[in-house]
Every structure is written in C-alpha cells, then in structure tokens.
C-alpha cells in the first residue's frame, strides 16, 4: 500500500477524508475561480462497491464535470485510495452523511513564505492527466519519451541523460513528459525529493527571497533536491540575476550527481540573451526535440483520448479533426472536448456536419489551407532545386532528399492519401510515397539538424 494513501477504520470516514484531499487538489490545480464555479458546491454522498457517489447542485454542473473533469477526479481519488474504481455524479442527494467542501485555504504555491520553502509538495504542482500511460508515442516524440522514461526509471541513480533538455513548439508534449517523470518517481521512489516548476516561478521565488533576505533558504531548497525540473527555460533569457542563480544551482546539482530536466521552445544553441556558459551546459546531456505532430500521431492521440473519456465518435469526425487541427496537441484535445461538450449539453448526435459548425470559428482563425503544391514550392526553394525536380525521377541525393521531405510534409500537413500525394509527384505510386515517409522518419530519429529544418518548414507553411 502506498504511503500516500489514507487508511482509516471506518470506510465512510475514509472516503469523506479522501474527498477533502481531492477537493484541495482540485483547488490547487485549477485555481480559486474555476474551483468556485464547478466544485465548491459538490457534495460527497456515499460509497458503494468501490464507487464514490458525488452530488452536484444542478444538472448543468453535473454534466459539465462529467464531460471535463470526471477522469481527473477519479485519478485523484485513486491516488489516495486505489480500491476506488469509479465515480458517479448525481443531482439528487441520497440519505446519509454528506460533506461539502466550500471554503478551502486560499494559500497557493505562489504564497508560500520562507518558513515553508523546504516543504514543497510536488503533487500540488503536477497535473494528474499527464502520465506515461496516457502519453501517445509516435515518430515526432519517441526519443523524448524514451529519454524521459529513462530519467524516471533511474531508481535514484542519475541517468545518462543529465541534463535532459526537451525542446519544441507549444502544446507538443514537453510539459506532459515532465509531469509524467514526477508522477513516476512519486509512485515508485517516493523518498526522492523532486521539484517541478516553470522558469517564471523560479524567477519569482528568487526575487521574493532577495526581497525578504532569505536567499540562503532559497538556495537550500533548490540545491538539496534529487530531481529538479524547470519548464520553459527561455523565460530567463535577458534576466541576468536569475540566470546567475540558475547557473550556480545547475552546477551544484550536476556536481552532486542530481538529475535535471529542462524544457524550452527552442534548442540551446538558438537561445538569445542568455550567457554562453549556460547555453553550453544546457547541451551537456541529451537534447531531445519534440517536433510537430504527424497525421498518424494526431489520430492516435484522439483515439486514446476518446477511449479514456468512454465516448463514441464517428470515424469521419476523428479523421476530420486529425487532418484539420495540426498546430499542436493542446489545441487538438481542446477541439475534441468542445465537440463532446456540445453534444452532451445539446443532446445532439456527433456528426461531421455538426463538428464543422461547432469548430467553424476555430478552423477559420487557424486554418491556412496547405496544398501539396505549396509544400513542393517551399521545399524546392529551401533546397535550391527546380520545382520540376519534385515530379521528376532524378535520384541524385540533392534532389531525392528534398523530394522525400516534401512527401513527408504532404502527409503530415494535408489530408491527402498516399496515392493522391504520389500523383502530385510525377504520378508515383503510394508505395514510393510510403518509402519516402519512412526514410524521413528514420532520419529524424538521429539527425537533430534535419528535425530542426523540418520543424522550420512546417512553421513557415502553417503561418
């Protein structure tokens, strides 16, 4: 039994106690405004056959929590008591003891004073949705995933990837992997001290420590951990004092064989307004790129999410979402949630036509219709070859490689089938296109320069 689980003699009291902790975690994670809007009036009613029954004040609140937060609430309950298998949310109270969690302490992480600097609760900063189990792996993220798992599974020893530097665009899974590392360590090696926070919070805590003359406590907090994870390190660019403190913290941890995990929106070499000595150290370990999603990865993410939410979505709707929402995973999941919520509240069936109407504004603001011809022109220009080379059969490497990249991008950024793509490249068959895509995916596994090049091409085409 995990040391984090709550064991009481009376099972009813146990679940009431667990609900108090779950409510506090919801408050810590989502903040006061959202908590008061959705959770503050939710009651614990009873437990039956390992099912927790909660009561919402209205049908609207019940349906919204079910569609948006039921999986999160269940995972939180299971964190404290793994005998809980499901939750049920009703609107009519049942006889028996109820507990409403309405007034919670308003103290959040940002309010922690110096006397509490060393009592950091990593659980309050981790998102229960972000674990290795629900991270969908594909060619764009498999190196980063494997490295993150290696760090998490190192069982107290420092992994070979130290520091682990994850970089890529917004919403592609970097933060998910960092949270997953934290959860895995907490569950399998809870004695290890782990801190996860954004670079922005690191800076604010440092400034607060300077103002309150408590820098020693600040240093002790961050330099005594086993694993330090800093998200969005680009935030400290141009902030000299914070960079200086981060530099010494980095050196202390690395010198003492402590693990560091850092995320950024660009590679270390592309960071501006940051000291060269920091830039150099960020690249000491493993630098793993999380690059833009492919159609197949987006499809896998949607199918995984749909299975978790236990809903039925027509295949043409799933294909439509995977083809049209190409910018990042966060936006893809947001679009899916919007479609499901609309169906729940209007009681309308999920169809392709309804989905197109629901997401009309999102698609209009986001969509830059990319054609195979657009891709061919951009890649040909980038590699200084003739546009006609895209449809030729020339096998010279300086022509064949850009053509393969253009085929790869055509599959990633357009809804075209392999056969349709082949027609645009001199009437080549689908097996030729498939071979080109696989060849590029193999190269992406080890060629950091090529990954950056393709990421750049994707951004240019999408914008």
Curated annotation (Swiss-Prot):
GO biological process entries: DNA replication initiation; regulation of DNA replication
InterPro entries the record matches: AAA+_ATPase, Chromosome_initiator_DnaA, Chromosome_initiator_DnaA-like, Chromosome_initiator_DnaA_CS, DnaA_C, DnaA_dom, DnaA_N_dom, DnaA_N_sf
Highest taxon above the source species: Bacteria
One Gene Ontology cellular component annotation held by this UniProt entry: cytoplasm
Region named Domain II: 83-124
Keyword terms: ATP-binding, Cytoplasm, DNA replication, DNA-binding, Lipid-binding, Nucleotide-binding
Region feature Domain III, AAA+ region, mapped onto this chain: 125-343
Region Domain IV, binds dsDNA, annotated ranges: 344-463
Secretion signal span: none
PROSITE patterns referenced in this protein's UniProt entry, alphabetically: DNAA (PS01008)
Molecular function (Gene Ontology), one example: DNA replication origin binding
Binding site residues for ATP: 171, 173-175
Region (Domain I, interacts with DnaA modulators) location: 1-83
One matching Pfam family: Bac_DnaA
Main location: cytoplasm
Cell compartments where the protein resides: Cytoplasm
NCBIfam families (UniProt xref): DnaA
Assembly with partners or alone: Oligomerizes as a right-handed, spiral filament on DNA at oriC.
Domain notes: Domain I is involved in oligomerization and binding regulators, domain II is flexibile and of varying length in different bacteria, domain III forms the AAA+ region, while domain IV binds dsDNA.
Family as reported in the entry's similarity comment: Belongs to the DnaA family.
Chain's role: Plays an essential role in the initiation and regulation of chromosomal replication. ATP-DnaA binds to the origin of replication (oriC) to initiate formation of the DNA replication initiation complex once per cell cycle. Binds the DnaA box (a 9 base pair repeat at the origin) and separates the double-stranded (ds)DNA. Forms a right-handed helical filament on oriC DNA; dsDNA binds to the exterior of the filament while single-stranded (ss)DNA is stabiized in the filament's interior.
Name under which the protein is recorded: Chromosomal replication initiator protein DnaA
Gene from which the chain derives: dnaA
